Amino acid sequence: MNEVFDRERTRTRTAELVAALPAVEWITDGRVERLSQDFYWFSPVLERQLRGLRADAVARPRTEDEIRTVVAGCAAAGVPITVRGSGTGNYGQCMPMHGGVILDLSAYNRLLWVRPGVARAQAGIRMMEMDRQTQATGGEHGLGWELRCVPSTFRSATLGGLYGGGFGGVGSINHGPLASTGNVLGVRAMTIEPDPKTVELRAPQALLLHHVYGTNGLVLELEVGLAPAYPWLEAIVCFDGADAGFDTAIAFADALASAPGIVKKSVTLLAAPIPDLLLAATPLLKGTMSAGSHAVFVLVADFAEPAFQQLVAEHGGTVTLRKTPAEVRASNRTIVEYTWNHTTLHALKVDKGLTYIQSGFEPGRHVQQAKTLRDKLGDEVLVHLEFIRTKEGAMNCSGLQLVRYTSDERLNEIMQIHRDHGVYIANPHVWRVEDGKQGQVNPDIVATKLRFDPQGLLNPGKLRGWAERERIVADAAAGRVSLATLPRF
């Protein structure tokens, strides 16, 4: 099927589906507009390009049978389907380019089972709720378990949403991005056909549907690795001094991230003036950071505090916030919600002229690369680094740098300057899969879509490689390209 959908025909057939399936919860009122959006507006480029996109209806199924009913109806009628978790992602991942039905999986949200180090859940479960249930398995004296990495939006973000549109998050300092071997063990997916089938994909094939915006398969369940749920101490460490302070702050952050004997969950560097933006954005941080300082936000196991404090002293930092695990629980607030994409969210409350970029540094050179780029770009780019392990296990950092936006041309120049210095850019100002993190057409992704979504109804328009599917099939048949092996279904 060509990705040209007649909008009037789609509206009519969607309305017919809504009328024909009264047992499913449908949303057709003004809420559809909100449910058709994500945080695309972080990008001034995407805000112009995607503004006004809207589904024709939202289905909110609660069971697999209801999902199958909606999928079968859409497939029979040729109606596009855009899968949604909680809509906390970026780049318009869950925004429908061609209308149709948004399949909101937030009510399909059960934790199915927990075993030591692994759990299985339905795609719509919120990660905060999943952690609550898995942590409870430790009993009165046991640690229990928790997700290996969560986004800063963990309160509302779903497990399926992280898998379909995310990269990593808090915890990736130990376990790498979600795509690291052992993090995703299996997924159960549904084909988009008039008679939908369900298929279990085990790792590594389970990653064929990862981070492609729900374009090549509908994921119902995920089986993921868990980590011990240590009691986490939260702290902010500040460093004063414009340049010397930054150099010391990044040295401290890197030393803490790399220290194998200090159990940790998160290390975030926010260079000045980002702490000032956060202080202006929320009164909850009042008194937690000194004006003009560089700040490192840290989660370490409470029993690791002496070693952590030793590193602070060695680097001349000042602990300006310290919250015990009990205090974090009692307040129901965490500094996690000022890291990762929440940093950008809070900064935009204060300065709407900001946007951001996403970058990946080179292990072993990451500290020097960050210093060099800060020197070169000055106050035009504000340094925000998240320390993580790579898929291969090396300590590194990812950047979510804030950028003072002036024009699309200058934004592209800034990203190119990073590339010229050996820093990878996952462009957050584009909405097609291959134009962002993927970087190029992946034949395996396209071939998987052909198997799971032969009509091209899933999130149409987002996968550039779909237009090349015939060439990819021909190349595979001629032996010019080797494709991943999928189970028979």
Roles of regions detected by a PLM:
Residues 1-72, 88-118, 279-285, 330-351, ...:
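N-terminal flexible segment immediately upstream of the FAD-binding catalytic core
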Residues 4-5, 54, 79, 86, ...:
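Conserved glycine-rich FAD pyrophosphate-binding loop
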Residues 26-30, 59-61, 81-85, 103-105, ...:
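General beta-strand structural signal in soluble alpha/beta enzymes
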Residues 127-128, 132-135, 142-255, 484-489:
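FAD-binding subdomain of flavoenzyme oxidoreductases
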Residues 242-245, 298-306, 362-366, 403-408:
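Helix N-cap motif at beta-to-alpha junctions
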Residues 246-279, 363-380, 407-415:
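Short amphipathic alpha-helix segments
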Residues 264-265, 273-323:
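A conserved active-site cap/scaffold subdomain adjacent to cofactor or substrate pockets
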